[in-house]
């Protein structure tokens, strides 16, 4: 309830500010975070968000607002100085190159909602284009559970191929995905990834699940039975054949994989393969992260008064 109510409030605020012609990030942050309860309630009066921002229901309104504020705290770090648009970049067929959406470990918690939103915007922008089997646009997510829930992910995995979309995502373990998307949706997502690559895992539940995904192979086992009688003429040998199903890859084999070794399962009638890769160091072409220049802080009024006082005193003494 709290998350859904927050989404309604955020979308309503964006729509209303756009209609008023003042849809800047700072104005959005002022309305949702800094405004008083009275102004906050008045802003949403007569909109679909009104039931969640009613001044009379201050406890519920405060709880919903607190949930929303915790998710949009990253907006205060954005500046109104760039005309770059992710949607326009996706829609411009002449554009090429890479767009990196990343954050340092100490910034991830704050920027997680923002990076998730950017990724979702990019995926949705692709699926607004005309279908084109010759187009190729890759979405590579290094750690899928490191993001919040991507609303467009399931639809993108099922439909983006006709728009030229290719998605690659990495996870450490299946329970991480379940924690965000739930069991049924997580299973559906993994089914939609046609090509699967599994590296070493030490968790028994995860390795058992991987073994099941890689499948089983049917083998024929011949058993020889001997029978003995009181007379040598009654001795006999009989052969029986049994069909057995065994895992192609045992969980213990997944646990014992070396670094850069993996099992690959491709779509179609291709056998499961074990691969060994060679490590190729990346070339450092530029700095991994460049911090923006801090704006000079304005001097406090008290500091100005003291400074002016000292200047006046020195002037009189001179």
Language model: regions and residue ranges:
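P-loop NTPase motor domains
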Residues: 1-166, 180-183, 192, 252-273, ...
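Conserved ATP-driven motor cores of ASCE-family P-loop NTPases powering translocation/secretion/packaging/pilus
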Residues: 157-159, 163-263
């Amino acid at each position: 309830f709290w998350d859904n109510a927050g989404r309604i409030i955020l979308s309503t605020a964006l729509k209303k500010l756009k209609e008023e012609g003042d849809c800047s990030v700072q104005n959005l942050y002022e309305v949702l975070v800094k405004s008083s309860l009275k102004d906050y309630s008045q802003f949403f009066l007569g909109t679909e968000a009104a039931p969640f921002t009613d001044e009379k229901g201050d406890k519920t309104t405060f709880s919903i607002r607190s949930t929303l504020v915790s998710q949009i705290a990253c907006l205060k770090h954005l500046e109104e100085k760039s005309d770059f648009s992710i949607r326009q970049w996706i829609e411009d067929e002449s554009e090429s190159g890479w767009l990196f959406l990343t954050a340092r470990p100490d910034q991830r918690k704050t920027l997680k909602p923002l990076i998730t939103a950017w990724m979702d915007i990019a995926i949705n922008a692709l699926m607004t284009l005309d279908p084109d089997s010759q187009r190729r646009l890759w979405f590579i997510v290094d750690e899928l559970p490191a993001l919040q829930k991507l609303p467009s992910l399931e639809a993108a995995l099922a439909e983006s191929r006709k728009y030229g979309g290719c998605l690659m995502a990495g996870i450490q373990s299946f329970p991480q995905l379940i924690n965000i998307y739930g069991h049924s949706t997580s299973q559906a997502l993994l089914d939609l990834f046609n090509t699967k690559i599994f590296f070493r895992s030490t968790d028994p539940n995860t390795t058992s699940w991987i073994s099941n995904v890689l499948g089983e192979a049917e083998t024929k086992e011949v058993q020889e039975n001997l029978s003995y009688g009181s007379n040598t003429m009654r001795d006999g040998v009989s052969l029986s054949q049994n069909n057995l199903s065994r895992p192609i890859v045992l969980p213990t084999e997944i646990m014992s994989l070396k670094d850069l070794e993996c099992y690959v399962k491709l779509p179609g009638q291709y056998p499961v393969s074990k691969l060994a890769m060679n490590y190729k160091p990346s070339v450092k072409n530029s700095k991994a992260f460049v911090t923006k220049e801090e704006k000079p802080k304005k001097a406090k009024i008290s500091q100005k008064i003291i400074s002016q006082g000292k200047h006046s005193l020195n002037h009189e003494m001179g």
